[in-house]
UniProtKB/Swiss-Prot annotation:
Keyword rRNA-binding in annotation: no
Enzyme class, first EC level, given as a word: oxidoreductase
One Pfam entry name: Flavodoxin_2
Name of this chain's protein: FMN-dependent NADH:quinone oxidoreductase 2
Known function: Quinone reductase that provides resistance to thiol-specific stress caused by electrophilic quinones.
Cofactor(s) essential for the protein: FMN
Family membership noted in the UniProt record: Belongs to the azoreductase type 1 family.
Subunit-level organization: Homodimer.
Keyword Kinase: no
Length: 199
């Protein structure tokens, strides 16, 4: 049995395309892997705090030297990190906001990219510790950006996933959603066709 962790980050709810893609993924994954467990963390409904001095301080101190506020911040970060460590498959649903990812998703990443936990420093440079995991990134984009210099979403997420040792990453883009005509339908159809091959 595998554990699947899904990270939702769209600020929209019912009309969110990235959430639609997530639901399609869940339906197809459950049909193909009925014994797997799926955990969904919704960063829009339950936002993760941005990094602050308490969390940064807590990371740098031994347990006995942490203040109550530092310990509280660290406990939240530990919960997020433990979810990721326990997962075999990571799914990130990310609409493109201003050529990049939602700030809620960036905040989550800031909590789980942790030295000594998800990566470590070595004499030859950083080494990711989450090898053996798979990741899928489901994106929704108003325009068509794949392969262009305006895409600061896929390159960034590939970089951070690789940094923590997740190199098996597949991106599924629903593009051109706001371009009018039949672009919206084509973008969804292409994304759904790729999703059908995932499970």
């Amino acid at each position: 049995m595998s554990r699947v962790l899904i990270i939702e980050s769209s600020a929209r709810q019912q009309d969110s395309v990235s959430r639609q893609l997530t639901q399609t993924f869940i339906q197809q994954w459950q049909a193909a892997h009925p014994g797997d467990s799926i955990t969904v963390r919704d960063l829009a409904r339950n936002p993760v705090p941005h990094l602050d001095a308490n969390l940064l301080g807590g990371w740098m101190k031994p347990a006995e030297q942490r203040s109550a506020a530092e310990q509280d911040s660290l406990q939240r970060s530990n919960e997020l990190t433990e979810e990721l460590l326990a997962a075999d498959v990571l799914v990130m649903a990310a609409p493109m906001y201003n050529f990049a990812i939602p700030s809620t998703l960036k905040a989550w990443l800031d909590h789980v990219l942790r030295a000594g936990v998800t990566f470590k420093y070595t004499d030859t440079g950083p080494q990711g510790l989450l090898t053996g995991k798979r990741a899928y990134v489901l994106t929704a984009r108003g325009g068509i950006y794949a392969g262009s210099t305006a895409d600061h979403q896929e390159p960034y997420l590939r970089q951070v996933m690789g940094f923590i040792g997740i190199h098996d990453v597949e991106f599924i883009h629903a593009e051109g959603l706001n371009l009018g005509g039949d672009f919206h339908e084509k973008g969804l159809n292409q994304a759904n066709a790729k999703l059908a091959q995932v499970a």
